[in-house]
Regions:
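A short, glycine/small-residue-rich beta-strand->loop->alpha-helix junction that serves as a flexible
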Residues: 8-20, 236-239
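Conserved nucleotide-sugar donor-binding subdomain of glycosyltransferases
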Residues: 77-118, 122-123
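A donor-sugar binding/catalytic signature common to diverse glycosyltransferases
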Residues: 116-119, 303-348
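Donor-nucleotide binding loops and adjacent catalytic segments primarily
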Residues: 204-315, 346
Length: 410
């Protein structure tokens, strides 16, 4: 039996989500031939323990270097100071990096992996190369374009890309060109293009609606149109996103615009319905009284509810997450309004805007205007989305499993 090590970077949920889609494909096709180990830290480590309660001995906790949260994404100032100084309850980053590389190296020595799969963990690429272990790196960025305000991050981008280069195979979790959402985040050098494979998006496949309709689904099924406003990211990012949304809703142009806000938080106290009468209702009460609503707030949507929302909404407002963009643009053929947090998001939304699949909005005023533009030119967006959706490749996990099998055989 072959042993595979999966190293999951703990910043955000995207790396974890992608790896779990891949794990399912591995278990469906190779479970009798491979033994999976996973390594991460923090919240993602806890999620791995919950996901694999019978295999806790194969889940390894190694603290990986991550930025410090700021008001909107990572704090550049605090993260820079943290390189040599303790900051926000964290030890100096230099000591974290040293311990992280040492512990991952020891894990390699102890487990004798036949293959490693790294999603976001570039340090593991370097360790694998030094130990002559075959290595796959899964990504949607290599040398992303930096906007003028972030030029000082360029040395870090070069450092990360040089470690990505050390992988045996670089897997891009996106459709091949010219339908690559993350195109502006790649910019591969000629010397490594031969090891790059565009495998397709790591989709979880179609959602089977096996449960009775929830109150949320009942509330949205017979309305004329509404927007799906997603709140994702770390705590501080969620807070500022919600504040921006509220400011947008208070503008005169938005007084009649229906919206469903998903808070991505398992806090049922967030669940409420705002009627056009200005009163607030519970979900059950709103359904029973057939309330004509203007806003629905949901703490957490089930997979079935999310699928229903995406099927019925007219557009989605998101931060530019690669996974979410693929699901909405490709899977559901719905236009997006993108409000970016990172340059990675800005690049992906800009790519979308350049192809008339959505709109980039960096201010509240632009967000409000974007809603109007989508309503006024909806048919044009639908035509472009129809072509993009036809070429949306969802075979990422299946194609990656084929590559894994070939690398293990060779």
């Amino acid at each position: 039996m072959k042993k595979i090590g999966g190293f999951v970077y703990p910043w955000g949920n995207g790396h974890f989500t992608r790896m779990m889609h891949l794990d399912k494909a591995i278990q469906d096709t190779m479970k009798d031939d491979v033994q999976m180990h996973y390594t991460s830290s923090g919240e993602i480590y806890q999620k791995l323990l919950q996901k694999f309660p019978q295999n806790k001995d194969r889940i390894h906790n190694i603290e990986m270097p991550t930025p410090i949260d700021g008001k909107k994404g990572p704090s550049i100032t605090l993260s820079s100071l943290n390189f040599l100084l303790p900051m926000s309850g964290r030890p100096p980053l230099l000591s974290v990096v040293t311990n992280y590389l040492r512990k991952e190296g020891n894990l390699y020595n102890n487990q004798k992996f036949d293959l490693v799969i790294n999603d976001g963990d570039v340090g593991s690429n370097a360790i694998a190369q030094r130990r002559n272990v075959k290595c796959i790196f899964i990504t949607n960025q290599f040398r992303p374009k930096l906007w003028a305000s972030r030029f000082y991050l360029y040395p870090g981008v070069i450092y990360v890309s040089k470690n990505i280069e050390k992988a045996t195979k670089i897997i891009v979790a996106d459709s091949p060109p010219p339908y690559t959402i993350c195109e502006y985040n790649l910019n591969f050098t000629d010397k490594i293009k031969e090891k790059v494979v565009y495998v397709g998006h790591f989709s979880n496949g179609g959602i089977v609606h096996s449960k009775p309709k929830s109150d949320v689904e009942k509330l949205i099924e017979n309305v004329d149109s509404f927007g799906y406003w997603m709140i994702t990211g770390n705590k501080s990012t969620k807070k500022i996103t919600l504040e921006n949304y509220k400011t947008s809703f208070n503008s005169s142009e938005m007084t009649k615009e229906r919206r469903l806000i998903s808070h991505a938080s398992s806090d049922s106290s967030l669940d409420r319905v705002l009627g056009k009468d200005g009163k607030t209702y519970s979900f059950a009460e709103a359904v029973e009284k057939k309330i004509d609503w203007i806003q629905i707030d949901v703490g957490f949507l089930s997979e079935q509810e999310k699928d229903t929302v995406l099927n019925l909404c007219k557009y989605a407002v998101i931060n530019g997450s690669h996974t979410a963009m693929g699901e909405i643009l490709g899977g559901k053929a719905k236009p997006i309004i993108g409000i970016p947090v990172y340059d990675e998001h800005t690049n992906q939304i800009k790519w979308t805007q350049d192809r008339n699949l959505g709109i980039l909005a960096t201010t509240v005023k632009q967000t409000v205007k974007a809603v109007s533009l989508i309503h006024n030119d909806y048919n044009r967006y639908q035509e472009n989305l129809s072509e993009f959706s036809r070429n949306y490749n969802t075979g990422g996990t299946k194609n990656t499993v084929k590559i894994i099998s070939e690398m293990l055989e060779n």
